[in-house]
UniProtKB/Swiss-Prot annotation:
Native source species: Archaeoglobus fulgidus (strain ATCC 49558 / DSM 4304 / JCM 9628 / NBRC 100126 / VC-16)
Gene: vapB16
Family: Belongs to the UPF0330 family.
Protein task: Possibly the antitoxin component of a type II toxin-antitoxin (TA) system. Its cognate toxin is VapC16 (Potential).
Annotated Pfam families: VAPB_antitox
The entry's keywords: Toxin-antitoxin system
UniProt xrefs under HAMAP family: UPF0330 (MF_00794)
Name the record gives this protein: Putative antitoxin VapB16
Length: 73
């Protein structure tokens, strides 16, 4: 088990998202898994109906939306 720190506003939002006796870890995992499923659903919806160049364009647009946070050592 690991400890993480989040801003107060993030804590409050996670607290509101909890269902029943769900832990914060459960909430975060649910959010992550939901995001993965949406990505898979999008790919399945377009599978076979787009040309390779159209699919590549969509993939590149989605990659640009993805933010990576860098950490100073």
């Amino acid at each position: 088990m690991k400890n993480i720190m989040v801003r107060d506003e993030v804590y409050e939002k996670l607290q509101k998202m909890k269902k029943g006796r769900e832990s914060f870890s459960d909430v975060i995992l649910r959010l992550i898994e939901g995001r993965k499923k949406r990505g898979i659903e999008i790919l399945e919806r377009y599978a076979g109906s787009l040309s390779d160049s159209e699919l590549e364009k969509i993939v590149m647009e989605e990659r640009r939306k993805f933010r990576v946070r860098s950490f100073d050592s």
